[in-house]
From Swiss-Prot:
Gene3D superfamilies associated with the record: 1.20.1280.50
Species of origin: Arabidopsis thaliana
Organism lineage: Eukaryota, Viridiplantae, Streptophyta, Embryophyta, Tracheophyta
Record-linked PANTHER family: F-BOX/RNI SUPERFAMILY PROTEIN-RELATED (PTHR31900), SUPERFAMILY PROTEIN, PUTATIVE-RELATED (PTHR31900:SF30)
InterPro entries linked to this entry: F-box-like_dom_sf, F-box_AtFBL13-like, F-box_dom, FBD, FBL13/AtMIF1-like
Protein name: Putative FBD-associated F-box protein At3g12840
Domain (FBD) ranges: 101-152
Amino acid sequence: MYPKAKATRVCSDAARINDLPDDLLATVLSFVPTKDAVATSILSKRWRPIWKRAVNLESDCVELCAICALDCFSFILMRSSKLRVLRFKQKRCCCNLLREKWKQPDFVPLSLYRSLEAFEWIGFKGREKTEKKAAFHILRNACNLKTMAITTSNTFQENTNILIDFDRMCTNCRISIKP
């Protein structure tokens, strides 16, 4: 398909990027959208932690795959001090597996505590040990959260139960569940 010289050039360009020190790669990732910086973690084992060292993941809105986000939740919030909108999309992605259990962070990042105003979870399934625990953590700790919107394919009864559980957690946040 491609001439041999073209393929060689692509490989040499990739090799040049991989020759850069991690600190420089982290600095470069500071200038790309948070979603793209996190996505670099699938490139190789070496790249997995690099995005976490990015100096400035400043964004007021972050949209991530829910499965990946559960793994790096604390790091995203820690590095995004002005985060106002957090959006999870439930989909199969780079990691291609479902989490069976979510580990709650040991601390509450300031962005979650102070600045998060809106949270949206598209494709929420309501799994007890993962999604519900993560959503409860956000509701419990996001003091300025005004809206939580959940889109789900669950039955009406399941959605009603989820809404009742979430309503108990928060009095000052508007929670909506859409099928």
